[in-house]
Amino acid sequence: MDVLKSLPVTDNHIHVDDKHGYGAEKVAKTFYNAGGKVMIVLNKPTFDGNLTASMDILVRDVEIINKNTPVKAFGLVGVHPAELTYLMKFMSLEEAKQRIVDALNYAKKLVEEYDFIVGIGEVGRPHYPVSEDVWKASNEILKYCMELAKDIGCAIQIHAESSTEEQFKEFSEMAKEVGLNPEKVVKHHCGNMVLEGERYGIFPSILASRVNEDVVKKSLRFVMETDYIDDLKRPGVALGIKTVPRVTRRLIEKGVLDEEGVYKIHKENIERIYDMDLEL
């Protein structure tokens, strides 16, 4: 019997794309057949000027997964930070910033309207070099996202440059300034940042390929992700959809993780971040 059959397995950062990839239903079924149980799905950046259409598509995709597959899916909606520099090709920084703020207000409405939309993300700041003005505006947008999350009592997933202790400290202080519990702040695409997460309250979402014995021995206060992209023209650009179940299974078989540890990472931490009760 598969060791994962009765265990929760959650991928905390997935993109699905009916237009360019396999689409929501096929991706979810592949994930489930590999041993996955819960998907946290986020809308992709579109770079076409329409910042809300992808959020509506995300709502539809999560509904499709929950209706047509055994997987439990939840969504986060937001504006990817790279959209700012894209919009600036056609308008001023201030105009682009206002367009993003308007879209984030729409994201807030979706979180309030749908029980399965559980947070705002991915939002943050560019992971590539930008001007001081763009960096400042990106941080202002990120702080506004935190204010929205505080107002509606939800989590936020941050896309930013590579994680450091100083960054975790900065995000923690930013959250506290607006009254948001840092535990509701998830840093996407992390490496081994579990101790820094404990120190500053930020929740690290660690790439499954980087979850190993060293990480698990330090702390189980993290979640796992692939950042799966679902684009047939870009195979291998991110981890495959089967990776979180595969890595979890391997850690169990090696004796690194026991059942209690699996429940901690894949169920309890997810419930804690997103204020949900996973009935699996």
UniProtKB/Swiss-Prot annotation:
Stored Gene3D superfamilies: Metal-dependent hydrolases
Record-linked InterPro entries: Metal_Hydrolase, TatD-like, UCP004961
One Gene Ontology MF term: hydrolase activity, acting on ester bonds
Pfam family, one: TatD_DNase
Annotated family: Belongs to the metallo-dependent hydrolases superfamily.
Name of the molecule in the record: Uncharacterized protein MJ1127
Organism, scientific name: Methanocaldococcus jannaschii (strain ATCC 43067 / DSM 2661 / JAL-1 / JCM 10045 / NBRC 100440) (Methanococcus jannaschii)
